[in-house]
Amino acid sequence: MRPKANQNHKLKVLLVFLLATLILIFIVRSTLTSSQEHQTPQETRSTRCSGACNKLPRSLAQALIHYSTSVITPQQTLKEIAVSSRVLGKKSPCNFLVFGLGHDSLMWSSLNYGGRTVFLEEDEAWIKQIKRRFPMLESYHVTYDSKVNQADNLIEVGKGPECTAIGDPRYSMCQLALKGLPAEIYETGWDLIMVDAPTGYYDEAPGRMTAIYTAGMMARNRKQGGETDVFVHDVNREIEDKFSKAFLCEGYMKKQEGRLRHFIIPSYRDGSESESNRPFCP
């Protein structure tokens, strides 16, 4: 369904405001850094750098121009985007993993300026199209073996001990674990994970069952401890609703805004004595 024109306008205003705020913060930081520099033998080099150092990063400028002029708005609503952007505002620069590549990808990457934002996408042709427009975005192709019509069976499979055992998804015996991602995806400690893909609105589509499960397992298996903020979009649909509650856990859910749910999942690798006794869900 096409969004209402008024909603599109409000969303565009929010995106431009967020990016403009980010740019203002960047400029203020750059100015403060420059003003605090002392005279040293490297004065000449610092002076030569000042213009380039204070220059607006190309990625931010491109994002601001794109969302100011584009007639296409992201799929999430203004209020939904605000939930994730508030968390990014506190944690960025950070490691941000996004299942899905779309019209909002440049926004997420820009809001995490200075951090690493990675997109996992099922459609190779779409990846190529986006890369032509925004080559600075880091994205990888993902193949999903699951189908929406298998969801009922998979949620039962997920209750078994092979799926509730905490470990690296690459070596998991659980049918829900995604095993074919690039090695660095498993080896990175992700601060935020957004599940807004793959396609899940018809029976033969891959659905988000494995993406949701794997996001939760990556958060629990995070080696350096800490917590991971996990977001799931389209929870108005049955699969996103059931699988997020089952594998990200209602006890870890912090907020729901519209079709977006926000979970905060602790690492189960914190080195404490209770680590091995911690239940899959609280």
From Swiss-Prot:
GO BP term (any one): xylan biosynthetic process
Alphabetical keyword list: Golgi apparatus, Membrane, Methyltransferase, S-adenosyl-L-methionine, Transferase, Transmembrane, Transmembrane helix
Membrane topology: Single-pass membrane protein
Tissue specificity comment: Expressed in rosette leaves, stems, flowers and siliques.
Keyword Glycoprotein: no
TM region positions: 13-33
Phenotypic effect of disruption: No visible phenotype, due to redundancy with GXM2 and GXM3.
Compartment list: Golgi apparatus membrane
The keyword Transferase is annotated on this UniProt entry: yes
EC numbers, comma separated: 2.1.1.112
Leading EC class: transferase
Reaction catalyzed: glucuronoxylan D-glucuronate + n S-adenosyl-L-methionine = glucuronoxylan 4-O-methyl-D-glucuronate + n S-adenosyl-L-homocysteine + n H(+)
UniProt GO cellular component terms: Golgi apparatus; Golgi membrane
Cysteines paired by S-S bonds: none
Sample GO molecular function, one term: glucuronoxylan 4-O-methyltransferase activity
Function: Methyltransferase catalyzing 4-O-methylation of glucuronic acid side chains on xylan.
Family from the record: Belongs to the methyltransferase superfamily.
Protein name: Glucuronoxylan 4-O-methyltransferase 1
The gene coding this protein: GXM1
